[in-house]
């Protein structure tokens, strides 16, 4: 919602494509968890998607994931019962374990986010952007989509298959973002 406020108030003369929200922390965590599970290098994990909000309603998606450009088959129960909740709650786990947030992980994610925007990436990235109805998500909410970044600009991947088991979760995170937008609108001019 911070980016939505920025796009409405602070940066009205900038194109909405210049406003993005940080989902890289969640994306990095998802890649790390999967790499550990598969005993692979993080940099060899490709096409992980984080849909929606930077909250516990986010939808980590491995159904298009590859390792070194090869498709992988993962146990659906592990994805739904272990992986998704772990990514969704990882920030809380760190705070509970350490007694404070992981500022180093957040700083690293900010660096990675800016680096991807500046230099592009050959992999899909999770980037919160202002929706325009992609994947039947309501327009004008900051929603994390799979994107490809080249030359300082991003394009939302428009051909990602969403596994049917994730459909309801996408609606939950969308509804949360719609509610947040409505709360914020009360305070905007």
Question: Residue ranges of each PLM-predicted region?
Answer:
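Single conserved hydrophobic/aromatic residue that forms the stacking wall/gate
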Residues: 1-6, 10-11
């Amino acid at each position: 919602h911070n980016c939505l406020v920025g796009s409405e108030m602070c940066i009205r003369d900038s194109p909405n494509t210049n406003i993005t929200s940080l989902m890289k922390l969640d994306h990095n965590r998802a890649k790390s968890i999967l790499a550990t599970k598969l005993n692979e290098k993080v940099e060899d994990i490709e096409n992980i998607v984080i849909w929606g909000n930077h909250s516990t309603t986010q939808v980590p998606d491995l159904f298009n994931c590859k390792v070194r450009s090869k498709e992988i088959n993962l146990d659906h129960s592990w994805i739904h019962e272990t992986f998704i909740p772990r990514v969704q709650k990882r920030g809380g786990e760190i705070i509970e374990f350490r007694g404070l947030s992981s500022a180093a992980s957040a700083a690293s994610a900010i660096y990675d986010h800016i680096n991807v925007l500046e230099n592009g990436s050959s992999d899909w990235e999770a980037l919160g952007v202002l929706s325009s109805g992609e994947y039947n998500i309501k327009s004008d909410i900051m929603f994390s989509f799979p994107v490809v970044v080249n030359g300082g600009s991003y394009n939302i991947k428009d051909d990602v298959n969403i596994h049917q088991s994730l459909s309801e979760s996408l609606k939950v995170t969308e509804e949360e973002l719609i509610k947040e937008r409505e709360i914020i609108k009360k305070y905007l001019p």
